């Protein structure tokens, strides 16, 4: 597995070693040992999968403590633009984001540590999206930001009139209005490799 650092410390792209032959391909999608050595120690406790069509945008979501989550995400079928936004007060990259295209062809994975809002938009006719979380889903701790907050300057690569949102995702606050954010100093130690 190759680790590609991004402009925001702790947010990484993971490129697996792919073995191809005339039968197809094989790759190791996750190794606890290698992830701990190259990224950081994490104990994933829940795997989720979603199916969506072109233009569906899910996000920008996060969970507040004590159920804050790190996520390791990837695409099984299709293509998405995946986005992580730094919402850690006091962070040198507060309000900045990293975006990466995840596809069934590139097999890339995207690691989003705690302290980030996460979302993705579907770029192909259909997508099957999978993600690992290091904490359980807790609806009472849900938080979210507006996907179209101009301060975030996210180019979603899909025209705004083609974006499909859930009812809930249509009414989130902008970052400057957010009533709750993560504290950078309390999270910095868990974003470092062991």
Residue ranges with predicted function:
Residues 188-194:
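Conserved small/polar residues in nucleotide/adenosyl-binding loops
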């Amino acid at each position: 597995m190759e680790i590609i650092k991004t402009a925001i410390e702790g947010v990484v792209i993971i490129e697996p070693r792919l073995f191809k032959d005339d039968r197809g391909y094989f790759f190791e999608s996750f190794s606890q040992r290698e992830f701990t050595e190259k990224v950081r120690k994490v104990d994933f406790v829940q795997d989720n999968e979603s199916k969506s069509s072109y233009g569906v945008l899910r996000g920008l979501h996060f969970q507040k403590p004590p159920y804050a989550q790190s996520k390791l995400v990837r695409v099984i079928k299709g293509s998405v633009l995946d986005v992580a936004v730094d919402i850690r007060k006091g962070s040198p990259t507060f309000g900045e984001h990293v975006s990466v295209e995840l596809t069934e062809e590139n097999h890339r994975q995207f690691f989003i540590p705690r302290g980030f809002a996460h979302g993705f938009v579907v770029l192909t006719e259909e997508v099957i999206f999978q993600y690992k979380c290091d904490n359980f889903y807790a609806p009472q701790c849900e938080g979210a930001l507006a996907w179209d907050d101009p301060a975030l300057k996210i180019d979603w690569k899909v025209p705004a009139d083609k974006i499909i949102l859930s009812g809930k995702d249509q009414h989130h606050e902008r970052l400057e209005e957010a009533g709750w954010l993560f504290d950078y100093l309390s999270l910095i130690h868990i974003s470092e490799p062991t």
